[in-house]
Amino acid sequence: MRLRWGQHMLLLVVEFTIEPFVEGQPGPHVTQAVAAVEQHGVKVDFGPFGSMFTATEASMPTIVADMMRAAYSHGATFVSVSVARQSAS
């Protein structure tokens, strides 16, 4: 994406959880969903109760759709997604 002088790229923070929860090690419904996000060149901060990544406003819908397709096609029963603007630092 090419920005003109003075334009700012809006970044969004996407937090997500994928069920069922598997004790000990995440199942393929989680690992494949994370892999789907990372195929877009985005790093996922993986946590035990939820994970997150940052994406541009333009790329977020495609990344989330790919993540959800991967999760459900590998056995997810519920996916929760929350999206917020990244706070200015």
Descriptions of predicted regions:
Residues 2-89:
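Charge-rich, low-complexity N-terminal segments
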